[in-house]
Structures are given as C-alpha cells and as structure tokens.
Swiss-Prot record:
Its EC number is 3.5.4.30. The active site is at 143 (proton donor/acceptor). InterPro entries: dCTP_deaminase, dUTPase-like_sf, dUTPase_trimeric. Bifunctional enzyme that catalyzes both the deamination of dCTP to dUTP and the hydrolysis of dUTP to dUMP without releasing the toxic dUTP intermediate. NCBIfam families: dCTP_deam. It comes from Nanoarchaeum equitans (strain Kin4-M). Keywords: Hydrolase, Nucleotide metabolism, Nucleotide-binding. The gene is dcd. This is dCTP deaminase, dUMP-forming. DCTP binds at residues 115-120, 133, 141-143, 162, 175, 184. Homotrimer. The record marks 130-131 as: Important for bifunctional activity. PANTHER family: DCTP DEAMINASE.
Length: 198
C-alpha cells in the first residue's frame, strides 16, 4: 500500500523511517522530496574501451586534490562540489548521490522517481534503478543522463527526486541481511555488478 502524507509523517516521527537531514516541507501528498548531494562520479572518456560486467571493479590508482576537490580513480573521476553548480553536458551520464541519508524498516519498500520539473529540462535522474528494498540504508545513488541538447546546471541541495513509500508484510530477510551490495553506500557509488559473477 502506497503511504500518504499523514502515514509518512507518523513513521518519521516514530523513527521507523529515518531521513536525515529532514524537514516536514519535504513531505508531499504521497511522497517525500529528496535533494541532490554534492558528490558526482564521471566516466573517464577515452580511457575505457569496453565495460565488462564480470570485471567492473573500480580500483583506485591515484588521488589528486586541489581547490575543486577532484579525486581521480581508474574508471571514474570523482567530483565534490560545494556551492558552484555541476554542469552535465548533452549526452553525458554521471552518477550522483542524494543529500539525505535514508533508512527503511523491513516492512517498507520504496520507489524513486525524478521530479517533473527536472524531467521537463530533459534530465533523467535514474536510468533504470528506482526500486529500494526493505532494510536499505545509505545515500541513494542516482544515474543521471542529460537527454537535452544543451548543458544543465545542477546545484547541491536542489530538489531532484521523489521517494514513494510502500507498506508491505515484513520480509523474511531485508536488504542488509541479504548482503545488499549498496548497503550503507556513501556518495555516488559505482556498479558492483562483478559480484553477481562470483
């Protein structure tokens, strides 16, 4: 059953659902607004010939920091922004994180959707992974794609997504207990699909 605003508020007040930081203004009639974090992960163009899901580990090879706080990795470049916008160019794909930390109980599942105002700019905020299992905990990763023919500026803490919450019968084993790959993820987290081949 999809939760309404009253039920969402009640579960947050009881600390059954944890969203931090949180303001009651984020509660919509049947969802919660979520904001964009400040961590982005970008594929390093020209350095990857092909992606092999069996061997997609993101091995750290070097770290460089300057005033823009850029950290270099093998397959990605990590960018942490503070006040300036992050610009996503036409046809670009980036991983980003949600600002809020989320924790769901074993009887709540969730679905993540882009906000309509964001979609009308030509921005897809999750290319396919919108489902969140009961027991999830962490900062959700967004898979952002610019379908527009012009660049789009993204600002830290701007409203970017809506989280719908569904009450279900309590699961036998939740996301944590099943060893979910992205349990307690922080920042924009790379694919760990290679673990499916072990």
């Amino acid at each position: 059953m999809l939760l309404n605003d009253r039920e969402i508020k009640e579960l947050i007040d009881k600390k059954e659902i944890i969203i931090e930081p949180f303001s009651y203004e984020q509660i919509q009639p049947a969802s919660i607004d979520l904001r964009l974090g400040n961590r982005f992960r970008i594929f390093r163009k020209g350095e990857i010939e092909v992606i092999d899901p069996k061997d997609f580990k993101d091995e750290l090879i070097k770290i460089e920091q300057d005033e823009n706080k850029i950290i270099e990795k093998y397959k990605y470049t990590d960018v942490i922004i503070t006040e300036n916008p992050f610009i996503i160019y036409p046809g670009d794909f980036v991983l980003a994180s949600i600002y809020e930390y989320i924790k769901l109980p074993r009887y709540i599942a969730a679905q993540l959707h882009g906000k309509s105002s964001i979609a009308r700019l030509g921005l897809i905020i999750h290319t396919s992974a919108g489902w969140i299992d009961p027991g999830y905990e962490g900062h959700l990763t967004l898979e952002i794609f610019n379908t527009n023919n012009v660049p789009i500026k993204l600002y830290p803490k701007m409203k970017i997504a809506q989280l719908q919450l569904f009450r279900i019968n309590p699961v036998e084993r939740d996301y944590k207990e099943k060893g979910g790959k992205y349990y307690k993820e922080k920042g924009a987290t790379s694919s760990e699909i290679w673990k499916d081949f072990i």
